[in-house]
């Protein structure tokens, strides 16, 4: 069994979310992480910002930071879920 590692994930979402929808979206993904045996989950909203260039015809985006601990095999599964979410413009998962 592999040991858990700490991760930091930055997610760029479309600008179409209001504050309550953004919290709901982030809470649902935090629950999904919990189901994949993640621990020490912390969600931080970094706000809506202008983008340097258009991504999928979007000039603004909402940034979400999620810090968590998990086994590497579950992180791969979670990143596959993010790839298929139409609200996600970009995401990056880093080891801490």
UniProtKB/Swiss-Prot annotation:
GO biological process entries: translation
A Gene Ontology term for the protein's cellular component: ribonucleoprotein complex
Location of this chain's protein in the cell: Plastid, Chloroplast
Classification via Pfam families: Ribosomal_S6 (PF01250)
Membrane-traversing stretches: none
GO MF annotation, one: small ribosomal subunit rRNA binding
Highest taxon in the source lineage: Eukaryota
Keyword Coiled coil: no
Keywords: Chloroplast, Plastid, Ribonucleoprotein, Ribosomal protein, RNA-binding, rRNA-binding
Physiological role: Binds together with bS18 to 16S ribosomal RNA.
Family: Belongs to the bacterial ribosomal protein bS6 family.
HAMAP family assigned to the protein according to its UniProt record, in alphabetical order: Ribosomal_bS6 (MF_00360)
Protein name in the entry: Small ribosomal subunit protein bS6c
Organism encoding this protein: Trieres chinensis (Marine centric diatom)
